[in-house]
Curated annotation (Swiss-Prot):
The gene is psbI. This is Photosystem II reaction center protein I. It comes from the Bacteria. PSII is composed of 1 copy each of membrane proteins PsbA, PsbB, PsbC, PsbD, PsbE, PsbF, PsbH, PsbI, PsbJ, PsbK, PsbL, PsbM, PsbT, PsbX, PsbY, PsbZ, Psb30/Ycf12, peripheral proteins PsbO, CyanoQ (PsbQ), PsbU, PsbV and a large number of cofactors. It forms dimeric complexes. It comes from Nostoc sp. (strain PCC 7120 / SAG 25.82 / UTEX 2576). The chain crosses the membrane at residues 4-24. InterPro entries: PSII_PsbI, PSII_PsbI_sf.
Length: 38
């Protein structure tokens, strides 16, 4: 099932992007001046 494999890759890439974004932004909760997630 090529469609299933593509869907899995999209989900994995989505979570990895969220993890990398949170890591690079150094937890927005610690930066009161940045409210990107609110």
């Amino acid at each position: 099932m090529l469609t299933l494999k593509i869907a899995v890759y999209i989900v994995v890439a989505f979570f990895v992007a969220i993890f990398v974004f949170g890591f690079l932004s150094n937890d927005p909760a610690r930066n009161p001046g940045r409210r990107d997630l609110e």
